[in-house]
């Protein structure tokens, strides 16, 4: 799938604009602060109903404007189109519409418009808390395993019930046992989906990474959130007193993590910033391949400031891999000359100059 039309109104400093992007490579260039990243943010808002730059959406709404709106027309892989719209009012009301109908949840957007973001904060995938890596993992599982979302919702409900009981002691023994059983069943299902996903992801990640950078010995492993040699029911029983003291459940899928190690160390501790960026890119590109295999569709990639941290050789290698995905890519940079060479002649490339919030489409540099 790809976006064939994007309409943006009152998003940060951007002037109202309608973009007709290329189905493949789109390069947005201009000075720092011109609004390039805000274009990526608008697409992200359309696909996930949230910003990647702010946990609150009020800062995204242009000054003195009552609301921001992003509309998109999606070219579906199986043919036909789908119209998506997201609007956020300053007073807090949020509207999501799909083909003219109100949507029930942002998950419907995510399913129709799978997005991959690579930006300066992407280092957090290696350096940050386990929660960030769980989000990465579960994004991938969600897009290849349709049974994952219902299982995840059951897990969250069971965890809320158990944690409430741990804090307040309001459940009778029979109810406690019932919720523990539900927690263990949902946990086993989630763990199975995650393990299967990592088994499929690892060889694709390793192959992709080898095309970007030589990092012999880098390993990717999955920790499920409790002892691999014990059943969760047993672990919960043995840690009950500690869970009550802490007020929440210590073991389970909510504690899962992905571990990237090199020479016995956490990869983030010994890799350079450029190497870390390439590892993150390899993970994101590998996810894109799995989405394509499972859905017979494609992710849309948002790559903010692609040239940063990379020399010419690695920049070209990354562009080549993004191009080989045959998906739609939006790339920002200050100087588009850094990205002018290396694309295949048959690959459609669109250039957009961004200056003080105004966006103008310029000619493909190869014409």
From Swiss-Prot:
Pfam families: SMC_N (PF02463)
InterPro entries for the chain: DNA-binding_RecF, DNA-binding_RecF_CS, P-loop_NTPase, RecF/RecN/SMC_N, RecF_2
UniProt binding sites for ATP: 30-37
Gene Ontology biological-process entries: DNA replication; DNA synthesis involved in DNA repair; double-strand break repair; SOS response
GO cellular component terms, semicolon-separated: cytoplasm
GO molecular function: ATP binding; single-stranded DNA binding
Family classification: Belongs to the RecF family.
UniProt name for this protein: DNA replication and repair protein RecF
Species for this entry: Pseudomonas putida (strain GB-1)
Encoding gene (name): recF
């Amino acid at each position: 799938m790809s976006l064939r039309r994007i309409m943006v109104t009152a998003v940060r400093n951007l002037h109202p604009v309608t973009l007709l992007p290329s189905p493949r490579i789109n390069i947005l260039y201009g000075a720092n602060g011109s609004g390039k990243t805000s274009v990526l943010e608008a697409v992200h808002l359309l696909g996930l109903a949230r910003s990647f730059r702010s946990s609150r959406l009020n800062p995204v709404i242009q000054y003195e404007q009552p609301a921001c709106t992003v509309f998109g027309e999606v070219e579906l892989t199986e043919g036909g189109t789908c119209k998506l719209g997201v609007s956020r009012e300053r007073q807090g009301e949020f509207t999501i519409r799909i083909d003219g109908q109100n949507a029930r949840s942002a998950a419907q957007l995510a399913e129709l418009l799978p997005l991959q973001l690579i930006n300066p904060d992407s280092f957090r995938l290696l350096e940050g808390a386990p929660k960030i890596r769980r989000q990465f993992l579960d994004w991938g599982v969600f897009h290849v395993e349709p049974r994952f979302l219902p299982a995840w919702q059951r897990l969250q409900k069971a965890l809320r019930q158990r944690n409430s009981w741990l804090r307040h002691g309001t459940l009778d023994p029979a109810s406690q046992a019932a919720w523990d059983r539900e927690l263990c069943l949902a946990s086993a299902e989630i763990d199975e989906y995650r393990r299967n996903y990592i088994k499929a992801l690892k060889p694709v990640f390793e192959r992709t990474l080898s095309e970007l950078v030589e990092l012999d010995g880098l390993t990717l492993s999955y920790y499920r959130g409790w002892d691999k040699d014990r059943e969760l029911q047993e672990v919960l029983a043995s840690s009950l007193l500690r869970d009550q003291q802490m007020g929440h459940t210590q073991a389970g899928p909510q504690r899962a993590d992905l571990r990237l190690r090199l020479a016995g160390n956490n990869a983030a501790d010994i890799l350079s910033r450029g190497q870390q960026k390439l590892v993150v890119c390899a993970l994101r590109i590998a996810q894109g391949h799995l989405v394509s295999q499972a859905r017979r569709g494609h992710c849309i990639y948002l790559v903010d400031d692609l040239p940063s941290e990379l020399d010419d050789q690695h920049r070209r290698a990354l562009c080549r891999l993004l191009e080989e995905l045959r998906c739609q890519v939006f790339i920002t940079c200050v100087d588009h000359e850094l990205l002018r060479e290396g694309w295949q002649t048959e690959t459609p490339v669109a250039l957009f100059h961004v200056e003080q919030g105004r966006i103008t489409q310029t000619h493909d540099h190869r014409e």
